[in-house]
Design a protein with these regions (language model features):
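Short alpha-helix
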Residues: 158-174
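Hydrophobic/aromatic residues located in beta-strands of well-ordered beta-sheets
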Residues: 63, 134-136
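Short low-complexity, flexible loop/linker segments enriched in glycine and/or proline
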Residues: 79-82, 100-101, 151-152, 192-196
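A short His-aromatic
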Residues: 110-112
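Conserved N-terminal segment of class I S-adenosyl-L-methionine
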Residues: 1-98, 102-106, 118-121, 236, ...
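Short, glycine-/aromatic-enriched active-site segment of Class I SAM-dependent methyltransferases
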Residues: 136-159
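A C-terminal cap/extension of S-adenosyl-L-methionine-dependent methyltransferases
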Residues: 178-282
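A short glycine-rich, Lys/Arg-flanked "PGG" loop and its adjoining helix->strand segment in the class I
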Residues: 118-133
């Protein structure tokens, strides 16, 4: 009996369901075009609909997509783009050594265990010619929005990969000039939209000099003993007011520092969703 559950095209259908579209993909992927400016032949591993392949072709680059999703392959062929419907690792293992100028892969490595990622990078190094470049884009582990939202949206995600870890893998298999960074194109309004600069609460400092000085009318004053108690009480209250003034001043200073502290915190965690690692084969 055949399995009634058909998972063919599941990834493609999911991306359409969540609203991923060509316009957004082109905007996000355009950031990586300068890395391949001097390349003649570039392969996009896990190319999906082929939006980056299309961008490369428009730049005069001989671009090829590789994706195991048959529906994505059909869509690419319908657009007149070159596609090999094959697993990315299998493709790299079989392609002629030193035949590629560039390799690009966006949001593939997070679907793989680290052993497979290392294999992918190893065979990518083999496939590239001297001076060839590789770029690997993946969810940004520095971004809070990745951990709280976007990373968990896809059923196939296996692990975050810190770009420095990817750089280590790249270096270990023989790549050099490895660097990493963030792609600012994808929107990431997680904390920025929730936090607005607000002036700190204004509490008037208590200035003892503004208290009105009044003379005591001795003829109409209460008995001396009562007056003495009243004077002691007044001194105590003034002492407390003076101490409160210092507290209010300190609180105001802390409130004044709060926006800068919040900006620093937001800058550290409200990062772009996508990061990348890149390197060159010597």
């Amino acid at each position: 009996m055949s399995d009634p559950i058909d998972l063919t095209g599941l990834d493609y259908d999911y991306l359409r369901y969540t609203g991923v579209n060509a316009a957004d993909q082109r905007k996000n992927h355009s950031f990586y075009l300068p890395f391949f400016r001097d390349c003649r032949r570039v392969v996009d591993l896990g190319c999906g609909d082929g939006d980056f392949v299309q961008l490369l072709v428009e730049q005069g680059v001989e671009a090829l997509g590789v994706d195991s999703d048959p529906i994505a392959a059909e869509k690419m062929r319908a657009r007149g783009l070159s596609i090999i419907a094959e697993d990315a690792l299998t493709y790299l293992q079989n392609v002629e050594a030193g035949s590629l100028d560039g390799i690009f892969s966006a949001h593939l490595v997070e679907h793989l265990r680290y052993q497979a990622v290392y294999q992918l990078i190893f065979y990518a190094n083999r496939a590239l010619k001297s001076g060839g470049r590789i770029v690997l884009a993946t969810p940004n582990p520095h971004a809070l929005i990745s951990h709280l939202d976007l990373y968990w949206l896809h059923f196939g995600h296996v692990s975050f990969y810190h770009p420095r870890l990817l750089c280590f893998f790249l270096h270990r298999v023989g790549f050099r000039s490895e660097t990493w960074g963030e792609n600012p194109a994808p929107p990431h309004p997680l904390l920025g939209s929730l936090y607005h600069h607000q002036a700190p609460p204004q509490a008037n400092s208590i200035d003892p000099g503004r208290f009105e000085r009044r003379s005591i009318d001795w003829e109409a004053s209460p008995p001396r003993e009562k007056l003495s108690r009243w004077r002691r009480s007044l001194r105590g209250r003034l002492a407390r007011l003076l101490g409160l003034d210092d507290i209010v001043r300190q609180v105001n200073q802390e409130f004044a520092q709060l926006p800068a502290d919040m900006d620093s915190l937001i800058d550290r965690v409200d990062r772009p969703f996508e990061c990348f690692a890149t390197a060159v084969k010597p």
